[in-house]
Curated annotation (Swiss-Prot):
Protein family: Belongs to the asfivirus CD2 homolog protein family.
Cross-referenced InterPro entries: Ig-like_dom_sf, Ig-like_fold
Annotated domain remarks: The C-terminus contains repetitive amino-acids that may function as a cell-penetrating peptide.
Organism, scientific name: African swine fever virus (strain Badajoz 1971 Vero-adapted) (Ba71V)
Protein name as catalogued: CD2 homolog
SUPFAM superfamilies in the cross-refs: Immunoglobulin
Topological relation to the membrane, as annotated: Single-pass type I membrane protein
UniProt entry keywords in alphabetical sequence: Disulfide bond, Glycoprotein, Host cell membrane, Host Golgi apparatus, Host membrane, Host-virus interaction, Inhibition of host adaptive immune response by virus, Late protein, Membrane, Receptor, Repeat, Signal, Transmembrane, Transmembrane helix, Viral envelope protein, Viral immunoevasion, Viral penetration into host cytoplasm, Virion, Virus entry into host cell
Taxon lineage: Viruses, Varidnaviria, Bamfordvirae, Nucleocytoviricota, Pokkesviricetes
Protein's cellular compartments: Host cell membrane; Virion membrane; Host Golgi apparatus
């Protein structure tokens, strides 16, 4: 019940508010729909503008004639039934509400200016698949969107939005009209390559950066895995090279295993080569005796140290000076002075001792003589066993060759 009352009230408000569109210099007729009783002849026309209400004119009926007073006769006039006639020779009368009041009854007329339309604006966005039609100037307009000669959407507002799907290459026409004019605008839409049509290039740049960073991260991850794998293989190879050679007992066991590797497989033994075998199916078999010599070569003999240099000879001492002659006494004649003795010769320098001979280097051990491998025993094959060349097995597995 409450819903019905609200609906009737809204319907009454809508029916009592009438919008009239008119152009400049076009006569506007506001009809009086009330039946006026001669006993109650008072009737009012009021105006509303910018939420301000003012009394426009007062009318009274005497007999069948309506007489009004208080209005501008150059813009307004009344008929015999008190209907209002407007002469819109300027824009002052537009965007106003004229209220007709009789007793407890009211009706509102809103007069709006009707403008001719301009060419609409049509835009599209390939990223969102959106077409937009926009009104630029006209009033009381209807907008229609036509795609491939078919109306797909319409509105009586100023903006029309439409999302399309499916085809990315078509023709769109935006048509706008009202009661006095009509115009349209056509656009050829081509979104077959959205990457080149993006209007929001920041989103495209964002995705490109994501792809580049992801590729770099994947490349770095693969490089790290490759480097670790190479280091692991290299370390394993170095450990195999630096491992000690097998002893003689192991050599005999290995040679014995090589010569007796032909056997019938047990039911539980798979007819497949050992893992990491260096030989594949149907390949020739080579026998090689492991070398017993160490991998490292014999050290070279140490060189002889150089002989110590001889010390320099000591210098000779200087000769002693001759003593002065003694003075003569007066009666005796003076004797000639004795000659000075010759200086003693310097002793010859001691000869340098001969250098010590180098100790003889230790003789290298004689290399082990090579002995030919033992011949394989001839084992006769049964008639129903096919030759070895047709069997998909590896007879001898050499896990390591030095």
């Amino acid at each position: 019940m409450i819903i019905i009352v609200i609906f009737l009230m809204c319907l009454k408000i809508v029916l009592n508010n009438i919008i009239i569109w008119s152009t400049l210099n076009q006569t506007v007729f506001l009809n009086n729909i009330f039946t006026i009783n001669d006993t109650y002849g008072g009737l009012f026309w009021n105006t509303y503008y910018d939420n301000n209400r003012s009394n426009f004119t007062y009318c009274g009926i005497a007999g069948n004639y309506c007489s009004c007073c208080g209005h501008n006769i150059s813009l307004y006039n009344t008929t015999n039934n008190c209907s209002l006639i407007i002469f819109p020779n300027n824009t002052e009368i537009f965007n106003r509400t004229y209220e007709l009041v009789y007793l407890d009854k009211k009706i509102n007329y809103t007069v709006k200016l009707l403008k001719s339309v301009d060419s609409p604006t049509i835009t599209y966005n390939c990223t969102n698949s959106l077409i937009t039609c926009k009104n630029n100037n006209g009033t009381n307009v209807n907008i229609y969107l036509i795609i491939n000669n078919t109306i797909v959407n319409d509105t009586n507002g100023d903006i029309l939005n439409y999302y399309w799907n499916g085809n990315n290459n078509f023709t769109a026409t935006c048509m706008i009209n009202n009661t006095i004019s009509s115009l349209n605008e056509t656009e050829n839409i081509n979104c077959t390559n959205p990457i080149l049509k993006y209007q929001n290039y920041l989103s495209t740049l964002f995705y490109i950066i994501i792809f580049i960073v992801s590729g770099l991260i994947i490349g770095i991850f693969i490089s790290i895995i490759s480097v670790l794998s190479i280091r692991r293989k290299r370390k394993k190879h170095v450990e195999e090279i630096e491992s000690p050679p097998p002893s003689e007992s192991n050599e005999e066991d290995i040679s014995h295993d090589d010569t007796t590797s032909i056997h019938e497989p047990s039911p539980r033994e798979p007819l497949l080569p050992k893992p990491y075998s260096r030989y594949q199916y149907n390949t020739p078999i080579y026998y090689m005796r492991p070398s017993t010599q160490p991998l490292n070569p014999f050290p070279l003999p140490k060189p002889c140290p150089p002989p110590k240099p001889c010390p320099p000879p000591k210098p000779c001492p200087p000769p002693k000076p001759c003593p002065p002659p003694k003075p003569c006494s007066p009666p005796k004649p003076c004797r000639p002075p004795k000659p000075c003795p010759p200086p003693k010769p310097c002793p010859p320098p001691k000869p340098c001792p001969p250098p010590k001979p180098c100790p003889p280097s230790k003789p290298c051990p004689s290399p082990e003589s090579y002995s030919p491998p033992k011949p394989l025993p001839s084992i006769p094959l049964l008639p129903n066993i096919p030759p070895l060349s047709t069997q998909n097995i590896s007879l001898i597995h050499v896990d390591r060759i030095i």
